[in-house]
Structure formats: structure tokens, C-alpha cells
From Swiss-Prot:
Name of the gene: ccpB
DNA-binding segment(s): 4-23
Listed GO biological process terms: regulation of DNA-templated transcription
Pfam families, A to Z: LacI, Peripla_BP_1
GO MF annotations, alphabetized: DNA-binding transcription factor activity; transcription cis-regulatory region binding
SUPFAM superfamilies hit by this protein: lambda repressor-like DNA-binding domains, Periplasmic binding protein-like I
Keyword NAD: no
HTH lacI-type domain span: 1-56
Subunit structure: Seems to be complexed to phosphorylated HPr.
Protein name per its UniProtKB record: Catabolite control protein B
Key words of the record: DNA-binding, Repressor, Transcription, Transcription regulation
InterPro entries recorded: HTH_LacI, Lambda_DNA-bd_dom_sf, Peripla_BP/Lac1_sug-bd_dom, Peripla_BP_I
Role played: Transcriptional regulator involved in catabolite repression of several operons.
Origin superkingdom: Bacteria
Length: 311
């Protein structure tokens, strides 16, 4: 198999010149660069990208930690990241955790071992105390408001956004309002923000007002059944995604249940079924997160939400 010494011999240049060509070094004459490429083509030589990455100290790959690889919320963030990464000739590696803290730490180790150049965390399983040390090895970017914690972030003002959704339901005369979420408030910053918004707008939050474990349409149907069979049936439900809202809508239709529904995501589902939906502009959030990865100075970027009312 050909190596750079053989390429150097056949091209009548030094090994260091071949190395510079492989690493796109500017200080090589165009004549020598063309000659080296011609010999590489004749020998059908393919550079060892891993070795070159080690020499450069860069892989041009960014890791994206996300809980699930098939969830519309995270799909939008990933779409934004990959679009921005492509424009800057970076590859993205998706790192699903299913909210397993140990798996998340294994992915953080990829940064320490230089397998990736940086990490964008769309949603985390570990406390920041377990994550901060890895900033020594490369950029770590969050897709949530990190507050006083020294981690660059692209974020929504979720409390304000969620409060707007609850206020909309209150303005429509609803007093018994419930909501769904993925994880409990003590494990999820997003749910904690939603719970805080609920209390600010609706008053006391009781266990009967919320249900976790909701990810898709099937979960939405089960959530609707849960609320429908409860002692005090809610007149309005704020679902954590349009898919979950669609499941609630389906159950309500089957059971002639007059319940108002709000979704999240502003997808074609909410437009077809005709319920309001909160749009957190997650693709733009992903684009902003990647821009922070490229920056030398840490910064925070706030992404504005939109509340799409029923037409």
C-alpha cells in the first residue's frame, strides 16, 4: 500500500511537502501541489483521515447530545445544527442518551479523547457539576438557559413562552387546566419552567394537573384517558408537542369530550387539526448553538418564540 514516503519519491519532493499538501497548508507552490495530487491519483492513495486529524488537532466533527433520535422537538434543533455545520464544512455526530447519565458521560469522554472538536447538548441527563470539567477539552454548548453557570447557550425564555400559552387558555375562560411533559420537574429544566409558569398564571399546581412520560401520539391518547378518567376532568390541556396534542385530540373526538388543546412545535399537525401551538423556533436555536461552537468568546443567544393561535 502506498505511503507518503513513496509519494514524495515519485513526485520528487520532500515528505514534509507531501504532508503540507495533505493538510492543505498554504505554503506549497501550486506546481508541487498538483504534482503530489497527480501521484496520489495514480497510486489510488487515500489519506488516513484519523492520522491527519491527530496531526491537525481537529476532526471537523461536532457531537450533538440528545435524548432521542426520533423526537420532533430535537429533530428541529438537529436540523438547525447540521445546516449550519454543513456551511462550515463540519460533520455532525448524533449521540442519543435516552436520558442515561452514564451514556452521556461516555459521550463527554469523546471530547476529552479528541474524537470530536466540541459538543452541543440539546438536553442533558447529568447535573452541570459532572459536565463542566469537560470544557477543558473543547467547547460545550447548551440549548437551555444556563444562567450563572459558565456555559455558552442558545435558549428560549421558556417561562415567558409557557406563561403565554397558559394565559391564552385562561383568557378563554378555563380554570381547570392540565399539561403534559416528558420528564418530571425535578429532572427536567423545561418541565420546571412549565410548572413555574403554570403557578404564575393558574395558581396552585397539584399532581392531577400534570402528567409526565409523554413523547408521541400514543402517549397523548393515554394522557387524555388519564385526565378524562380523573375525578375533576380538565377543560383544557397544554400538550408538550403537537404529536401528543394529536393523541389527546383523537381521544377527545372518540369520547365526545369538549376539551381545548394547545400543542407545541407549530407543525403541520396543529395546522391540519386546527389547535393553537407554541413555536419555540428550535431550528433557529440549533443554528445559534452551532454559531456559539465556532466563537472564541463565550456568549448567550436568546431565541424568540411565537404563539400561533387558532385560525
Amino acid at each position: 500500500m502506498a505511503n507518503i514516503k513513496e509519494i514524495a519519491r515519485l513526485a520528487n519532493v520532500s515528505v514534509s511537502t507531501v504532508s503540507r499538501v495533505l493538510n492543505h497548508h498554504p505554503y506549497v507552490s501550486e506546481e508541487k501541489r498538483k504534482l503530489v495530487h497527480q501521484v496520489m491519483k495514480e497510486l489510488d492513495y487515500t489519506p488516513n483521515r484519523t492520522a491527519i486529524d491527530l496531526i491537525r488537532g481537529k476532526t471537523h466533527t461536532v457531537g450533538v447530545i440528545l435524548p432521542y433520535s426520533d423526537h420532533p422537538c430535537f429533530d428541529k434543533i438537529v436540523n438547525g445544527i447540521t445546516k449550519a455545520a454543513f456551511q462550515h464544512e463540519y460533520a455532525t455526530t448524533l449521540l442519543p442518551t435516552n436520558y442515561n447519565p452514564d451514556i452521556e458521560i461516555k459521550y463527554l469522554e469523546l471530547l476529552r479523547t479528541k474524537k470530536i472538536d466540541g459538543l452541543i447538548i440539546t438536553s442533558r441527563a447529568n447535573h452541570w457539576d459532572s459536565i463542566l470539567a469537560y470544557q477543558e477539552y473543547g467547547p460545550v454548548i447548551a440549548c437551555e438557559d444556563t444562567g450563572d453557570i459558565d456555559v455558552p447557550c442558545a435558549f428560549n425564555d421558556r417561562k415567558t413562552a409557557y406563561a403565554e400559552s397558559f394565559r391564552y387558555l385562561k383568557s378563554r375562560g378555563h380554570e381547570n387546566i392540565a399539561f403534559t411533559c416528558v420528564r418530571e420537574a425535578d429532572r427536567s429544566p423545561s418541565t420546571a419552567d412549565k410548572a413555574a409558569a403554570y403557578k404564575a398564571v393558574c395558581g396552585r399546581l397539584e399532581d392531577r394537573h400534570m402528567l409526565s412520560g409523554c413523547n408521541d401520539m400514543n402517549d397523548g391518547e393515554l394522557a387524555a384517558e388519564h385526565f378524562y378518567m380523573s375525578g375533576r376532568v380538565p377543560t383544557a390541556i397544554y400538550a408538550n408537542s403537537d404529536e401528543v396534542a394529536a393523541g389527546i385530540h383523537l381521544f377527545a373526538k372518540k369520547n365526545n369530550w369538549d376539551v381545548e388543546i394547545i400543542g407545541e412545535g407549530n407543525t403541520s399537525i396543529s395546522r391540519v387539526l386546527g389547535f393553537p401551538s407554541l413555536d419555540l423556533n428550535l431550528e433557529q436555536l440549533g443554528i445559534a448553538a452551532f454559531s456559539l461552537f465556532l466563537q472564541d468568546e463565550p456568549a448567550d443567544i436568546k431565541i424568540q418564540h411565537k404563539f400561533k393561535k387558532k385560525a
